C-alpha cells in the first residue's frame, strides 16, 4: 500500500511556542489567559466539549495543537444567529465544522421518526441543543459570520452524506452535503491525515480551492482535469445491436443470388468486416482513473441507479486500490479522492498520546454529560472493522483495515486514567473499539490486502487469508490486569463471536476474567434471508459460541449470561422470518424489553436496499434480484411485536397476522405456541424503561431472560426523563434487587417468631 507522510513529520507552525493548553479555549477570556490574540483554527461542533480521545473535536483539536496551531472550540452554539460563531473572533486559517460524534438526525430522532427525549452528548442529557442537519446550519452560519474564511467540513455526518444520499426523514435523495452546506472542502473517514495536510498547506499560503490532491477529501470542480482517464458508470443494462440469426438451411455461398446483396448495390455495409488497425493505448493507471457515477438528478429519480451508485462506492473503499469518484450535481461535479491511508501503530500512539485532560471542559461545572459517563473509564485500543455489516456505518467511516495501538500506549493510558480521572475505582469499563476482538487481526499478506475488493473479511465465511490469531489481545488483557491499582478489566464492546470461536483460548480468557455477569453479542436474526442481507453469520455460529461461553463460565465457577441483540424490519425480512425469530426467542427463554427497528442511515448498503428494493451486494440491473422491504408503519409495528411476543399489547396484531399467515396453530396456551388465545383483563407487562418496573437483576437469568435489542451504545433511558444509568448505577440496581429478595426471604423465615422487625430497606438508585 502507498506510504503516507507520518503525522509527526510535518514542520511545526510558529505558534508552537505557546505550548499545549490545559483545555482548548471556548471563550475570549481563556484565549487571553493563554496569551493568544486570535485562533488559527476554530472547531465548531454539535457536542459538548469533552477533552477525551473518544470525542472527535478533542482528537482533531489536540492533533492540530501538536502541529503548532492555536485551536479554539465553539461547542453547541446557538444557531439562531451568527453571534456565537463570532465569539472567538475570526480564525486565521479555517473553520472546522462537524455535527458531532453522531449524525444529528439519528441523534434527535428514533427509527420511527419520533423526537428523542434526551441527548447523551449534551450537559444534563438535555435534547434540543443542536439543529437538524447541524453540519449544514453551522457551515451557513460560519459563512454568514466571516464570508471569506474557508470552511472544512468533517465528522461522521458529513462523511456519510458526501455523495447523493437517501434521506430517511424526508424520504428522498438529497444532494451531497458539500453542495447544500456551501463548504469549501469535505474530509471523510478518520480525518487526521487530511486535516493536518490541509492546515499545513493553508498555513503556507495555498488557497483552499487549489487543494485537490489530498486523499480522503471531497470538493466541487467544474470538469475532469487533463491527464485523468474517466470510466463511465452512469448506466446499467446497456442495450447492444442484436444480429438476426441466419437460417441454417439457406445457402449463403451464392452471393449474386442474394436479393439483399443485389438491393445494396455499391453502398458500403456498416456490418461488413473490415481490417482494424490496432493502436497503442495510452498507459492508464488506477491513480489517474476516475469513475463517473450516475448524476444526482438520475439517482434521485431512479432507485435502481441509486443502488448501482451505492455498489460502486462501496467497491472503491480499499485505500490500496480505490479509484477517485465523481458525481454531477447540476452544473458542477463533486469529486471524491480515494480514502485515506490507514494510520500506523506509531501514528495511532501519537494521536492517543496527546495531553488530553480526559474530563469535560470546566465551563460545564458539575453538569453530567451522559456519553462521557459511559466512556470515562474506557480505553480505545483500535479503529476500523472488517465485518462489513450492511446496516452499520463503522466500516464506511473508519475503513476495513484495523489500525492498532501498541501495548505500551494502551497501558500508559490506563495508568493516566488511574492517576488523573476523578472517581476511578480500579475498574476499566471497556478495553475495545468498534468491535472487542479485532485487535491485531489482519490479512496474512499485505499484497493480497492491497488488491482485495471484498466487502467483508468474515462473510459468507471467514476469509482463508485472514489471520485470526488473538494472542496479542490475550497478552494485552493479561498486562492490563497486572497493572497496580487495576482491579477489573471489563469488555463492553460488541464481540464478533464468529472470530472468537476460532480462538478457544481467547474465549476462555474473556469469560474467566473480563465479563461482568453479562456479555453482549449481536446475532441480529436467526433466519438466513435477513442475515444474508446484513452480511452476518448464521445462528449456528451463535450456538457454537454459546456452548463455549457456558463451558468456560462453568469452569471458572461463574454464573454469566449472553445478551443477544436483534433487529426488526431489516431489508430482506419477511413476516415468516420474524415469526420464526419469535419462536426461537420463546424457545430459548428470551424476552426483549427494548426493540431496535432497522434505521436507514445515510450511505449504508442496507439503506440502498430499503430505498431501491435491489441488492447492491451483487451486480445491480433492472432485472436483478429484488429485496423484501418493510416500509409501512403497520408492518414495522408487526415485526417489533414479534420481537416482543410476550407483551399483551401486541397480541391482537399478532393473532391477526398469524391467522393471515395460516399459522393459527401458534395461538393458544401451549408451551410451543407463541401467544395466548385471549387477551388478559389488564396489560400487566411492564417495560424495563418504566420507573415502576423491576430493576435489572431482580429475577434469576436463565428462565425468561430479559434482553435488550437496542444497541445504540448508550445506556437505557428512564421514561420519566431521568438520565441514563452508567455501569455503577446499574450495579447499584442489581444490588438493590438482591437485597430486596434477601429481605423478602428473611421476612418469610421469621413469620410466626417473635421480634418480627421490618428489615431496613436499601436506598433505591435513581
From Swiss-Prot:
List the SUPFAM superfamilies: Radical SAM enzymes (SSF102114)
**HAMAP family tied to this protein:** UPF0313 (MF_01251)
The record, for Gene3D superfamilies, names: tm_1862 like domain
The Radical SAM core domain is annotated at 371-649
| Family statement drawn from the similarity comment of this UniProt entry | Belongs to the UPF0313 family.
The entry's free-text remark on the cofactor is: Binds 1 [4Fe-4S] cluster. The cluster is coordinated with 3 cysteines and an exchangeable S-adenosyl-L-methionine.
The molecule here is called UPF0313 protein PP_4872
Q: Does the keyword Metal-binding apply?
A: yes
Query: What GO MF annotations does this protein's record show?
Result: 4 iron, 4 sulfur cluster binding; catalytic activity; iron ion binding
- Disordered, as annotated region: 670-766
User: Which PROSITE patterns does the UniProt entry name for this protein?
Assistant: RADICAL_SAM
PANTHER family given in the database record:
UPF0313 PROTEIN YGIQ (PTHR32331:SF0)
Amino acid at each position: 500500500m502507498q506510504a503516507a507522510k507520518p503525522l509527526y513529520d510535518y514542520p511545526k507552525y510558529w505558534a508552537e511556542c505557546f505550548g499545549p493548553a490545559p483545555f482548548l479555549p471556548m471563550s475570549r477570556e481563556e484565549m487571553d489567559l493563554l496569551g493568544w490574540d486570535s485562533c488559527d483554527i476554530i472547531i465548531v461542533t454539535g457536542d459538548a466539549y469533552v477533552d477525551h480521545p473518544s470525542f472527535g473535536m478533542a482528537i482533531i483539536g489536540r492533533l492540530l495543537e501538536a502541529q503548532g496551531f492555536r485551536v479554539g472550540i465553539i461547542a453547541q452554539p446557538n444557531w439562531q444567529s451568527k453571534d456565537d460563531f463570532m465569539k472567538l473572533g475570526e480564525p486565521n486559517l479555517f473553520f472546522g465544522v462537524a455535527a458531532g460524534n453522531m449524525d444529528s438526525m439519528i441523534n434527535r430522532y428514533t427509527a420511527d421518526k419520533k423526537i428523542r427525549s434526551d441527548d447523551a452528548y449534551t450537559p444534563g442529557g438535555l435534547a434540543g441543543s443542536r439543529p437538524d442537519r447541524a453540519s449544514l446550519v453551522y457551515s451557513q452560519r460560519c459563512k454568514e459570520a466571516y464570508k471569506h474564511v474557508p470552511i472544512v467540513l468533517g465528522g461522521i455526518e458529513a462523511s456519510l452524506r458526501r455523495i447523493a444520499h437517501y434521506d430517511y426523514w424526508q424520504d428522498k435523495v438529497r444532494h451531497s452535503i458539500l453542495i447544500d452546506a456551501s463548504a469549501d472542502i469535505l474530509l471523510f473517514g478518520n480525518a487526521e491525515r487530511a486535516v493536518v495536510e490541509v492546515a499545513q498547506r493553508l498555513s503556507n499560503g495555498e488557497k483552499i480551492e487549489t487543494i485537490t490532491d489530498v486523499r480522503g477529501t471531497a470538493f466541487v470542480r467544474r470538469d475532469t482535469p487533463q491527464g485523468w482517464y474517466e470510466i463511465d458508470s452512469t448506466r446499467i443494462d446497456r442495450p447492444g445491436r442484436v444480429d438476426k440469426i441466419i437460417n441454417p438451411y439457406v445457402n449463403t455461398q451464392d452471393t449474386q443470388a442474394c436479393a439483399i446483396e443485389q438491393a445494396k448495390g455499391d453502398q458500403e455495409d456498416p456490418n461488413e468486416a473490415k481490417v482494424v488497425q490496432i493502436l497503442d493505448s495510452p498507459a492508464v493507471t488506477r491513480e489517474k482513473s476516475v469513475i463517473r457515477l450516475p448524476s444526482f438528478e438520475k439517482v434521485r429519480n431512479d432507485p435502481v441507479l441509486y443502488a448501482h451508485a451505492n455498489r460502486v462506492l462501496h467497491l472503491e473503499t480499499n485505500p490500496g486500490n480505490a479509484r477517485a469518484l465523481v458525481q454531477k450535481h447540476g452544473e458542477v461535479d463533486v469529486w471524491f479522492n480515494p480514502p485515506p491511508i490507514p494510520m500506523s501503530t506509531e501514528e495511532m500512539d501519537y494521536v492517543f498520546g496527546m495531553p488530553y485532560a480526559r474530563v469535560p471542559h470546566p465551563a460545564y461545572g458539575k453538569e453530567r454529560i451522559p456519553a462521557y459517563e459511559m466512556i470515562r473509564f474506557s480505553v480505545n485500543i483500535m479503529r476500523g472493522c472488517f465485518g462489513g455489516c450492511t446496516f452499520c456505518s463503522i466500516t464506511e467511516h473508519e475503513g476495513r483495515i484495523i489500525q492498532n495501538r501498541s501495548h505500551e500506549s494502551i497501558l500508559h493510558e490506563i495508568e493516566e486514567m488511574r492517576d488523573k480521572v476523578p472517581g476511578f475505582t480500579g475498574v476499566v469499563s471497556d478495553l475495545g473499539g468498534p468491535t472487542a476482538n479485532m485487535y491485531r487481526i489482519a490479512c496474512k499478506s499485505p499484497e493480497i490486502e492491497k488488491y482485495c475488493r471484498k466487502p467483508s473479511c468474515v462473510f459468507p465465511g471467514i476469509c482463508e487469508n485472514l489471520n485470526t490469531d488473538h494472542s496479542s489481545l490475550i497478552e494485552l488483557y493479561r498486562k492490563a490486569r497486572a497493572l497496580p491499582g487495576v482491579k477489573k478489566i471489563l469488555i463492553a464492546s460488541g464481540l464478533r463471536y464468529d472470530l472468537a470461536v476460532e480462538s478457544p483460548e481467547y474465549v476462555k480468557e474473556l469469560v474467566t476474567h473480563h465479563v461482568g455477569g453479562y456479555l453482549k453479542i449481536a446475532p441480529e436474526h436467526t433466519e438466513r434471508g435477513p442475515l444474508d442481507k446484513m452480511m452476518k453469520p448464521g445462528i449456528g455460529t451463535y450456538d457454537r459460541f454459546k456452548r463455549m461461553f457456558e463451558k468456560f463460565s462453568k469452569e471458572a465457577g461463574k454464573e454469566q449470561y449472553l445478551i443477544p441483540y436483534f433487529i426488526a424490519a431489516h431489508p430482506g425480512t419477511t413476516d415468516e422470518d420474524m415469526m420464526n425469530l419469535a419462536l426461537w426467542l420463546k424457545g430459548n427463554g428470551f424476552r426483549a424489553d427494548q426493540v431496535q427497528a432497522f434505521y436507514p442511515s445515510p450511505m449504508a448498503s442496507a439503506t440502498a436496499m430499503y430505498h431501491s428494493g435491489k441488492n447492491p451486494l451483487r451486480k445491480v440491473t433492472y432485472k436483478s434480484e429484488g429485496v423484501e422491504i418493510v416500509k409501512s408503519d403497520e408492518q414495522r409495528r408487526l415485526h417489533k411485536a414479534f420481537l416482543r411476543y410476550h407483551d399483551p399489547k401486541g397480541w391482537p396484531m399478532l393473532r391477526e397476522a398469524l391467522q393471515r399467515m395460516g399459522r393459527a396453530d401458534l395461538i393458544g396456551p401451549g408451551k410451543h405456541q407463541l401467544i395466548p388465545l385471549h387477551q388478559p383483563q389488564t396489560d400487566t407487562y411492564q417495560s424495563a424503561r418504566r420507573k415502576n418496573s423491576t430493576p435489572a437483576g431482580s429475577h434469576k437469568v436463565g428462565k425468561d431472560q430479559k434482553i435488550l435489542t437496542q444497541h445504540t451504545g448508550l445506556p437505557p433511558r428512564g421514561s420519566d426523563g431521568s438520565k441514563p444509568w452508567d455501569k455503577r448505577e446499574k450495579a447499584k440496581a442489581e444490588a438493590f434487587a438482591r437485597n430486596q429478595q434477601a429481605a423478602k426471604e428473611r421476612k418469610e423465615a421469621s413469620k410466626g417468631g417473635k421480634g418480627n422487625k421490618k428489615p431496613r430497606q436499601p436506598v433505591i438508585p435513581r
